[in-house]
A protein has these predicted regions:
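Conserved functional hotspot residues or short segments at active or partner-binding sites
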Residues: 174-175, 179-359
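Short, solvent-exposed loop/turn elements at domain surfaces
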Residues: 11-13, 35-38, 170-171, 221-223, ...
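Generic recognition of long tandem-repeat/solenoid scaffolds
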Residues: 27, 161-162, 222
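Cleft-lining beta-strand/loop regions that shape enzyme active-site pockets
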Residues: 1-157
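Residue-level structural signal for beta-strand termini and adjacent loop
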Residues: 4-5, 90, 165, 180, ...
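Polar, glycine-rich mid-to-C-terminal structural blocks
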Residues: 121, 133-134, 140, 144-211
Length: 359
């Protein structure tokens, strides 16, 4: 008999932390969980030992989580006494959250990346840093979720979530988008952004001019529908060709990369001792392309005309093979190499004149 004991599988909230270039660190947070703050401190200290002087904090696609964790993270970047967020409702007295003196990165250059998938706790962090003139916000308008809800459990196991208050940024703006129309209209709002061109053009961003606020540094910010970035970066629909997208989402590229890495593991690990060596030197050659073509034929991927010259193919294969050898330490740096928002963040951090915060 074989006894199998289930092990604990940790779910991390920091996807990756690495140096984009000398002096500039990058940390991507996917959710605000109970362990996020401790994970951040570890990642921050690791990057500091590698010489990090400036930071890119990636909150894109981060749907939120615990308020406490968002406050702890924002506190790392704000000086003692500065307001982070406050909550208030008709029957919910105003409660203000302020920064303490424990922040470890209060004076260095900081960029925060957001997009339409950044919500709730992500918006609390981005809003606090924007309103205090502490960070340059880059990307696209965030989701717009700023409600405080209390959960009431019912006898049948279901629950009711009752809205009791709203979150407000330090300047007093609500980040909650309107929900005075139908429920369908509320949930379709993100699709409307796509239809109206907001994901591709900064001029198409809908802002309520009646809800203008001024930061201490004199910057105009808007309430009533998410965080509007200081620097807009459009959605990139051309990063990968349609063929590459089809092969990727079908799982064929993942399975090929897994088999390739497994078959050549000893050779590859002998040649590339570390993730940085793999990132800088591993390339996709003609033999590998022919192997993939044969693999696709064996999997009967009918209708897919693959040449190996498709946009993004080499990049995504390198990233997938790298993930099988070095996990996220190779996967994300390769995948992010031509990420428009990250490239813009690096450009801003290199050029002090582009930083939108008041020193």
């Amino acid at each position: 008999d074989i006894t199998i004991t289930r092990g604990k599988i940790p779910i991390y909230s920091i996807d990756v932390a690495y140096m984009v270039e000398p002096g500039i660190g990058f940390i991507k947070i996917s959710r605000f969980a109970g362990t996020t703050y401790d994970e951040y401190l570890k990642a921050f200290n690791d990057l500091s030992r590698q010489g990090m002087k400036k930071l890119i904090l990636d909150l894109r696609g981060n749907g939120g989580g615990f308020l406490r964790t968002a406050v702890e993270l924002a506190d790392e970047f704000l000086a003692d006494g500065l307001q982070i967020v406050y909550t208030e409702g008709k029957a919910h007295p105003k409660k203000v959250y302020k920064a303490s003196s424990k922040g470890g990165f209060e004076n260095s250059d900081l960029v925060v990346l957001i997009d339409e998938g950044s919500a709730s706790a992500s918006e609390i962090v981005a809003g606090a840093l924007q309103d205090n003139d502490r960070a340059t916000i880059i990307g696209r308008r965030s989701f717009g979720k700023g409600l405080v809800q209390d959960q009431i459990d019912l006898p049948d196991g279901s629950a009711v979530r009752l809205t009791i208050a709203r979150y407000y940024t330090p300047t007093g703006r609500s980040i909650q988008k309107p929900y005075d129309k139908s429920l369908d209209a509320y949930y379709n709002e993100e699709y409307e952004r796509f239809e109206h061109g907001e994901l591709y053009n900064a001029d198409s961003i809908k802002v309520d001019k009646s809800k203008q606020y001024k930061t201490p540094g004199g910057k105009t910010v808007y309430g009533g529908g998410g965080i509007v970035p200081d620097v807009f970066v459009s959605l990139d629909t051309m990063k990968f060709s349609p063929v590459v997208n089809k092969l990727y989402y079908s799982g064929l590229l993942n399975s090929f990369a897994f088999e390739y890495a497994d078959q050549h593991r000893a050779e590859l690990m002998n040649k590339y001792k570390t993730a940085p060596q793999f990132i800088s030197a591993f390339g996709v050659d003609a033999r590998m392309i022919e192997s993939l073509k044969a693999y696709l034929v064996s999997k009967k991927s009918n209708g897919v005309e693959f040449s190996g010259r498709e946009t993004g193919f080499a990049q995504i294969i390198r990233a997938l093979v790298g993930r099988n050898l070095f996990d996220k330490d190779a996967y994300y740096p390769i995948l992010n190499a031509n990420d428009a928002a990250i490239l813009k963040a690096v450009e801003v951090l290199r050029d002090a004149s582009q930083i939108t915060v008041k020193k």
